[in-house]
A protein has these predicted regions:
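N-terminal pre-domain/capping segments
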Residues: 1-68
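Short, solvent-exposed loop/turn segments at secondary-structure junctions
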Residues: 10, 32, 49-51, 81-83, ...
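A generic local structural motif
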Residues: 11-13, 132-133, 146, 164
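Active-site acidic/histidine proton-transfer and metal-coordination neighborhood
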Residues: 56-146, 155
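A short alpha/beta connector and helix-capping loop motif
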Residues: 133-134, 155-167
Length: 167
């Protein structure tokens, strides 16, 4: 397991002062931020890619390939999302799988992981996407890695009225 932290100026200062050690500097797909982070450690790109919203066909695959090739990003991360109007677990699972198949077709050989998103009262479509059983089914059936965001899991467990450890 590696310890990744969002890159920022305060983090850079802590690294400079030898106050913290991190394995990876987490950056969005922004070239300026990536260049600023490079002198301070290995850069990991945390992509803004969601499965379940039918938008993977609009991704910039040239940018994705370039960033995977030029950074220390071992996996393409995705987020297990949903869109308004999808209330069926089987429909959402099918959409996740379709989006994943599309990504794999565009990026053959790239290892893909999926991250759990938190559900919120103001984003009701994410309640279904945050279901731990549905997430587990997707991970197992599609040979995906899991990027388990513990803060997202805590938020979802509370809103789903579940024990955090069982989530």
């Amino acid at each position: 397991m590696k310890f990744a932290v969002n890159y920022s100026t305060p983090l850079k200062e802590l690294i400079e002062q030898n106050e913290v050690k991190v394995d990876l500097l987490k950056c969005p797909e922004w070239d300026g931020l990536i260049q600023a982070a490079r002198p301070w450690g290995s850069v990991y790109i945390h992509f803004d890619i969601s499965l379940g919203n039918n938008r993977v066909d609009s991704l910039d695959f040239d940018l994705i390939r370039r960033l995977l090739d030029t950074t220390d990003t071992p996996y393409l991360n995705t987020h297990l999302a949903n869109r308004l109007g999808v209330d069926s677990a089987s429909e959402l699972l099918a959409t996740w799988k379709e989006d994943l198949d599309f990504l794999r077709g565009k990026l053959p050989g790239v290892r893909i992981i999926a991250e759990n998103l938190p559900c919120h009262e103001f984003l009701p479509q994410l309640k279904l996407a945050a279901d731990p059983d549905l997430i587990s089914e997707m991970i197992k059936e599609c040979d995906l890695g899991l990027l388990l965001d513990l803060s997202h899991a805590q938020i979802s467990a509370a809103l789903l009225d579940m024990d955090f450890k069982k989530y």
